[in-house]
């Protein structure tokens, strides 16, 4: 799995460089902020102004962009590769955010957070169970986890993708029940499961847990 994870990380960084090539950065960031506002509205999650937030597997333009009044910790192993692509990492515009360049498995939270986001990231990691343990440790009692992931629709294709890396960016190929059971095993209670998008192979799900 470690080799597969390293390959996935390489192609993740490559994908972002290719995706952003020729795109006006201000327009992209404006679109991304609106995407996150719409996402929060769809899942009916309100964020109090001073609530502490962890954005685990934040990527270069994660949900950390839309919380200027909150203390935020944003963690990702590829931040060094994202910095040359995005000015907000170096221009001082995100002073409320502490960026941590680290795999989620190695991140030991310095505090517990009111709200933990792990969006489009959990199926990118090397050690799924260790990452879920880290998320559990980072979520304060009474706090919430918001986890989004592409989950397989069909058992047959799930097995095919597990054996043959047809989805190179995502080392983990699981279905919704698999993710729910893993969360339960790590002490989370899943409050809601919302499907935001349905395609042939995958459904895009948001799991809200505490």
Question: What would you call each of these model-derived segments?
Answer:
Residues 54, 58-105:
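Class I SAM-dependent methyltransferase SAM/SAH-binding core
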Residues 120-121:
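Short catalytic micro-motifs in class I SAM-dependent methyltransferases
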Residues 129-144:
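A short glycine-rich, Lys/Arg-flanked "PGG" loop and its adjoining helix->strand segment in the class I
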Residues 170-187:
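Short alpha-helix
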Residues 1-45:
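Class I SAM-dependent methyltransferase Rossmann-like catalytic core
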Residues 117:
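A conserved beta-strand element that flanks and buttresses the S-adenosyl-L-methionine
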Residues 146-173:
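Conserved class I S-adenosyl-L-methionine
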Residues 106-111:
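Short conserved loop adjoining the S-adenosyl-L-methionine
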